[in-house]
Amino acid sequence: MQPTSRLEIPRTAIKLHALISDLRWRVQLLDSDIQDEEKRTGISNISNTAYPILARNLRIRRGNLLATITMLESQLAETDMAA
């Protein structure tokens, strides 16, 4: 395995920052879409059996993105410590 150059660490950090920022923006879009769907159907209680499937799926996707953001933030912290 080749050693990481000093220039590679900042590039990695910049890429991670950009990716995290993009994913946070997508989470905000999903939040908006979820709210729109809940308003459209008039059902916002997720435990309601009539809760919209679209909103449920969007919530799952949002959760996955949030988990990815958490993982990337830990990678970023490791990268920052290596710099």
Which residues fall in each region the model found?
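Short, charge-rich amphipathic alpha-helices with coiled-coil/heptad character
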Residues: 1-13, 41-45, 82-83
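N-terminal acidic leader/helix
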Residues: 5-36, 70-71, 75-77
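Amphipathic alpha-helical coiled-coil segments
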Residues: 59-79
